[in-house]
């Protein structure tokens, strides 16, 4: 499906006026990819009684997991909006471009959380505390090694990366990247503690409080930092 959609993009998308065709191809490829999974569901799924379903008892735990995501999205949106209000739309644009590049690197660092979460959950469910500690120590060492290397690597090339990706008018993105590269290590450690420890060990309340508290502190500090340093204060 992916190869077919890629071929159609090269064949049918010729210039900027073909945006509609491009959107249709992407939508059809997504639908087609999902439809290819349906024939296999008959082997995996079994019939169940509707009376045996109790969706409401899962609602509160699900909401508690959803709150940190809401808090994170709110303060990310407020970062850009506050920067646009206090420092102008240009600074908000520079921040957005810098943040996009950092998120690409962060995707590699935080991917370990997706891998480690089921392993730590399984060990904790079996009462294997020693194994949980071992997994977390190994993960912390790996994430630290990877994140610190990426932080210094990104900071080293940040001066040229902004203009290389976005053009000569995006010089301020370079310094913003250099400053923001620090969060690669901080978010990497946060991922180990939050996603790989607090969530698997059923300490969702502690995880939620830490994320919400961090979001509130970030919003409060934004006022003086953005007022004094503009783009670099928001970063």
Feature-to-residue mapping (PLM):
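Short helix-kink/termination motifs in transmembrane helices of multi-pass secondary transporters
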Residues: 7, 62, 66, 70-82, ...
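Short runs within selected transmembrane alpha-helices of multi-pass transporters and secretion channels
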Residues: 1-6, 22-39, 68, 72, ...
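Helix-capping/transition residues at the boundaries of transmembrane alpha-helices
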Residues: 12-14, 84, 121, 198-199, ...
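Helix-terminus/linker motif at the lipid-water interface of multi-pass membrane proteins
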Residues: 11-15, 73-104, 122-123, 159-169
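Interhelical loop/hinge segments that connect adjacent transmembrane helices in multipass membrane
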Residues: 16-26, 32-76, 115, 119-134
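Interfacial/gating helices of multi-pass transporter permease domains
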Residues: 19, 57-65, 83-103, 130-131, ...
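Alpha-helical transmembrane segments of multi-pass membrane transport and lipid-handling proteins
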Residues: 35, 133-189, 216-223, 227
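Helix-loop junctions and terminal segments of transmembrane helices
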Residues: 98, 102-140, 144-147, 194-200
């Amino acid at each position: 499906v992916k190869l077919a959609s890629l071929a159609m993009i090269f064949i049918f998308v010729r210039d900027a006026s073909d945006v509609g065709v491009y959107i249709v191809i992407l939508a059809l490829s997504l639908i087609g990819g999902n439809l290819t999974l349906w024939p296999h569901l008959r082997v995996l799924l079994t019939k169940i009684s509707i009376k045996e379903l109790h969706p409401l008892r899962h609602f509160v735990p699900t909401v508690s997991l959803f709150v940190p995501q809401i808090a994170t999205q709110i303060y990310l949106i407020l970062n850009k909006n506050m920067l646009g209000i206090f420092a102008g739309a240009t600074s908000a644009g520079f921040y957005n471009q810098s943040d996009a590049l950092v998120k690409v690197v962060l995707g590699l660092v935080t991917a370990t959380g997706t891998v480690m979460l089921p392993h730590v959950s399984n060990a904790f469910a079996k009462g294997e505390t020693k194994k949980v500690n071992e997994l977390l120590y190994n993960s912390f060492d790996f994430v630290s090694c990877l994140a610190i290397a990426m932080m210094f690597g990104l900071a080293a090339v940040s001066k040229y990366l902004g203009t290389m990706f976005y053009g000569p008018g995006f010089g301020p993105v370079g310094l913003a990247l250099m400053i923001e590269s620090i969060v690669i290590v901080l978010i990497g450690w946060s991922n180990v503690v939050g996603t790989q420890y607090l969530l698997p060990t059923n300490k969702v309340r502690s995880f939620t409080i830490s994320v919400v508290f961090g979001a509130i502190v970030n919003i409060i500090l934004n006022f003086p930092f953005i007022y004094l340093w503009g783009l670099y204060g928001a970063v």
